[in-house]
Curated annotation (Swiss-Prot):
This is Protein argonaute. It is found in: Cytoplasm; Nucleus; Chromosome, Centromere; Chromosome, Telomere. GO terms for biological process: chromosome segregation; co-transcriptional gene silencing by RNA interference machinery; negative regulation of G0 to G1 transition; priRNA 3'-end processing; regulatory ncRNA-mediated gene silencing; regulatory ncRNA-mediated heterochromatin formation; silent mating-type cassette heterochromatin formation; siRNA 3'-end processing. GO terms for cellular component: ARC complex; cytoplasm; cytosol; heterochromatin island; mating-type region heterochromatin; nucleus; pericentric heterochromatin; RITS complex. Belongs to the argonaute family. Ago subfamily. It comes from Schizosaccharomyces pombe (strain 972 / ATCC 24843) (Fission yeast).
């Protein structure tokens, strides 16, 4: 049976009223005057209509030919850098030729413009007052205002999407990458008004430096001789499309020194051994790159043994003459050291964030912005104040009828036992150490294991085998062989298949961690736990307790649950789903991975998981029907009940993808239910979760915040700065250890359950207290967190992924979608991903 749900997003049913009423400051600035005239909208085609780099299209827009064609209308026109343009004036339809080359070497490209429609910004006033639904007219109006707001900062700053940077005071992150701090601004529709959301933005950029110096830092080479031995072709994918100039002593100040090249890769041979054919006096001549620069530019290469960079048209340039162009974002994934440096750079106390936002607002000086002024747009320079509520903290149940009432979102495990330890004792397990005996001697491991077993025993986990066999990894063997050896050793000593395997790693890195997880999760079907050697040496009971929380759920236990009074699910059997899609980073191979977790108990504490591969960068989850059928059957098998309600938390979707979630994923959930029985029709609620936004909230009174100056856990914001009529709210559910608390933005897309807002908001908040591996409330509902964890581990089951940077063709980036390595059936009912 096919099901076609409504394409409308759920409307706000009302507001909540529970909790302490407070007032917060929000980083939104109200637009007090909008353009009150009709704006002409035009369709723009550059060249043959194929995608043109944004920088090039912006150069064309700023060309003298386009300015002459537009006349006086150019100054009040706004261009999106792609295919749309808006103007107060009338511009004739037509096509002109623009020279994008030099005067000596002209290169013409066509620029066509055609009027497509008119937009009336009065529709925005109706929209924010819930008198007009969202349609292309509203979206075009918001896009126009966004671009109008960007126009002035775009003239002098480095801009990316909604963020702008001066490029000054960068801080090194290592590897030729540095962190810049700038500001973010975006037009937002709110309840009764439009506003500008302003925030601090931090991003990683390639350092404006010699490419040679950056390569040496990236490869950790201390001198150029070491770099000549390094296979730079392996880095082709990493450095591809990086823009450089070619500068040497004999072209300083010339157009040639300013010409920008885009790296395509690195040559396999050195500059002295890389040859090309040129025509000289009518004859073809073979010449090396090193010889060419000596003959044609009178410069001798200092490092002729280094390879060259490859650019378009097959040209080759010596690395030592190349300089990285300023203002290029570093889009690859930061390594662990760079990430730590970025966190230190970006973290700010709340009052510092407020001050910097206010400073940026005054620097932008919207009142004197000529583009805003000519359209009559005025923006208030004071942060909005918004009403908020602080919900009551839930109570948590542990074993032995122990009830915990957290304070400020935190508690500890002292004197507590897990609610539901594994019924069978731990009879068989083993430890493998990937650190040398010199760095971590056996005595250190034995001391740790004694504390570890004592701590887990006090938490309720019963160990028959208190002293497991310990092996040191033989680095000559593969990780697969080592895992199998450890499995057999545990089985031999314990006379039973291992309950889990324990691995001690030297540091937190993708390997051998990834291989351990792949082998244990797919081949051996045994839970695995990894720990870092420095923690083993310290042997702290608190660290052991943290490991215990993971071990307990991996072997089938439950750590804690909400007390009945704190659980809004009540007695109605409810399946909770969490969904997420992981996409490979820039330059990485591999497929996208969709992961769904589902509760298999009546309290929403225990979750099983499914992950599937799908085409790269596809956000809608494929095969949702089959996945949900499997998860519904699992819920029934574990609880002996059929869920009467399904609550689906979906992460990672942008506002533009909301309808896709309704029309595709919700439809398949419905079909899954009907496939089990034509009469089976549970009520469904679909809610998206978003953390990648720039809404931030700051306390007005100290008594309404924590010791760091952030709003308290349980703070709900659902008025003023939320959507004009859709059912959304912001929730700060966690205590922030450092920096500014990031609220999660919840948007209910579809609601058949019709829980009152108070009940649903309380459910979202209270679930954050039963995340299985923490003794603090987390920032996001656990099913979504679990889906993240599943996706992260499922990457190691992707047979097409390759974390090494090798030369890659465009075709290989669109490779066939192969299924992930199958999860062992022995793990399917356990929380193996913790």
């Amino acid at each position: 049976m096919s099901y076609k749900p409504s394409s409308e997003i759920a409307l706000r049913p009302g507001y909540g009223g529970l909790g302490k009423q407070i007032t917060l400051k929000a980083n939104f600035f109200q637009i007090i005057s909008l353009p009150n005239e009709t704006i002409n909208q035009y369709h723009v085609i550059v060249g043959d209509g194929s995608r043109v780099p944004r920088k090039q299209s912006q150069l064309i827009w700023n060309s003298k030919e386009v300015k002459q064609y537009f006349g006086s209308s150019w100054m009040n026109s706004v261009y999106d850098g792609r295919s749309m343009c808006w103007s107060k004036g009338d511009i004739a339809d037509g096509t002109i030729k623009v020279n994008i080359g030099s005067e000596s070497h002209p290169r013409e490209i066509e620029f066509s413009i055609q009027k497509s429609s008119k937009i009336n910004l009065h529709t925005l006033s109706q929209f924010v007052n819930s008198k007009y639904s969202s349609d292309p007219q509203v979206l075009s109006s918001i896009m126009f205002l966004d671009l109008l707001l960007k126009k002035k900062p775009s003239e002098t700053l480095f801009g990316f999407m909604h963020s702008f940077f001066t490029g000054e005071n960068g801080v090194s992150l290592g590897g030729g990458v540095e962190a810049w701090k700038g500001f973010y601004q975006s037009i937002r529709p709110n309840q009764g008004f439009m506003s500008v959301n302003v925030d601090i933005s931090s991003s990683a950029f390639w350092r404006n430096d010699s490419l040679l110096q950056i390569l040496m830092e990236y490869t950790d080479c201390s001198n150029v001789r070491d770099l000549t031995r390094f296979d730079l072709k392996r880095l082709s994918r990493k450095f591809r499309f990086l823009k450089v100039t070619c500068q040497h002593r004999n072209n300083v100040g010339t157009d040639l020194a300013n010409r920008v090249y885009s790296i395509e890769g690195f040559s396999s041979k050195s500059a002295s051994d890389s040859f090309f054919v040129r025509r000289l006096n009518g004859e073809e001549q073979k010449i090396s790159v090193a010889e060419y620069f000596l003959e044609n530019h009178n410069v001798r290469l200092q490092y002729p043994n280094l390879p060259c960079i490859l650019v378009k048209n097959g040209a080759m340039l010596p690395i030592e003459f190349c300089f990285v162009v300023k203002g290029q974002r570093y889009t690859a994934k930061l390594n662990s050291d760079q990430t730590a440096n970025m966190i230190r750079f970006a973290v700010q106390r709340p009052f510092e964030r407020v001050q910097q936002i206010d400073d940026f607002v005054h620097q932008m000086d919207w009142d004197t912005d000529p583009y805003l002024t000519q359209y009559g747009m005025k923006i208030q320079k004071k942060m909005l104040e918004v009403p908020a509520r602080v919900l009551e903290t839930p109570s948590i149940r542990y074993g032995g009828d122990c009830i915990e009432r957290p304070v400020s979102g935190r508690w500890n495990l002292r004197g507590k036992r897990f609610l539901d330890p594994p019924r069978a004792p731990i009879r068989s397990w083993a430890v493998m150490c990937f650190t040398s005996t010199r760095r971590l001697p056996m005595r250190g491991i034995e001391n740790f294991l004694q504390t570890y077993v004592q701590t887990l025993t006090s938490l309720g986990i019963n160990f028959v085998m208190k002293k497991p066999p310990v092996l040191y990894a033989d680095i000559r063997g593969s990780v697969e062989e080592l895992c199998i050896t450890l499995y057999k050793k545990a089985e031999q000593v314990g006379n039973a298949p291992p309950d889990y395997l324990f691995f001690i790693l030297d540091k937190n890195s993708p390997e051998p961690y990834g291989s351990i997880k792949r082998v244990c999760n797919t081949m051996l079907g045994v839970p695995s736990q990894c720990a870092i050697s420095k923690h083993i040496l310290q042997s702290k009971p608190q660290y052991c307790a943290n490991l215990g929380m993971k071990i307990n759920v991996k072997v089938g236990g439950i750590n804690c649950s909400l007390i009945p009074k704190s659980n809004p699910l009540g007695n109605v059997p409810t399946l909770i789903l969490g969904g997420d899609v992981y996409h490979p980073g820039v330059g990485a191979t591999g497929v996208s991975i969709a992961s769904i977790v589902a509760s298999v108990d009546l309290n929403g504490c225990k979750y099983t998981a499914v992950s599937r591969s799908q085409p790269r960068h596809q956000e809608v989850i494929e095969g949702m029907k089959d996945i949900v059928v499997y998860l519904l059957q699992g819920f029934r098998a574990m609880t002996k009940q059929q869920p009467q309600r399904i609550i689906y938390f979906r992460d990672g979707t942008s506002e533009g993808q909301f309808l896709s979630v309704i029309n595709d994923e919700l439809s398949q959930i419905k079909e899954a239910c009907h496939s089990l029985s034509p009469k089976y029709n549970p009520k469904i609620l679909v809610c998206t979760t978003q953390k990648r936004h720039h809404a931030r909230f700051f306390i007005k009174n100290k008594s309404d915040g924590d010791r760091n100056g952030n709003p308290l856990p349980g703070t709900i914001i659902e008025k003023h700065v939320t959507h004009p009529y859709q059912y959304d709210f912001y929730l700060i559910s966690h205590p922030s250890l450092q920096g500014v608390s990031v609220p999660v933005h919840y948007t209910v897309l579809h609601d058949e359950i019709q829980m009152p807002p108070d009940q649903f908001q309380t459910l979202c908040y209270n679930l954050c207290y039963v995340y299985a591996r923490a003794t603090s409330a987390v920032s996001l509902v656990p099913p979504v967190y679990y889906a993240h964890l599943v996706s992260n581990l499922a990457r190691y089951q992707d047979v097409t992924a390759d974390d090494t940077f090798v030369e890659t063709s465009e075709a290989s980036m669109d490779q066939e979608v192969k299924p992930l390595l199958a999860l062992s059936s022995k793990l399917k009912t356990k929380m193996w991903y913790m």
